[in-house]
Amino acid sequence: MSTAFRKIKLIFKKSDSQYPQNYRAEIKSRNKNTVITRHDLLIAHEMKQRASLERSNSIRNLQSQGKRRSDSKESRKL
C-alpha cells in the first residue's frame, strides 16, 4: 500500500496546480480508473502517521518492560 500511495501522492503533487485548492480536487490513478481525492490522500497520510506512532510507542513500551524486568532481576540477586 505504501508504495502505491507514494506514487499516487507524487502524481497528485505534480498536477496539483491544475486543480482548485479544496478537498474536492481529484486525480485519476494511472493504473486504474479510480478517482482519488485530496481528502483520501490526507486520510491515508494520517493513518500512516498513526501506524508509525503506534509502532514506535509499542517499541518504547517493550523496551521499558525489558528494563523493568532486568531491574527486578538485579534487585532479586541482591
Curated annotation (Swiss-Prot):
Biased composition (Polar residues): 54-65
Region described as Disordered: 49-78
Basic and acidic residues compositional bias, start-end: 68-78
Record-given protein name: Uncharacterized protein YPR145C-A
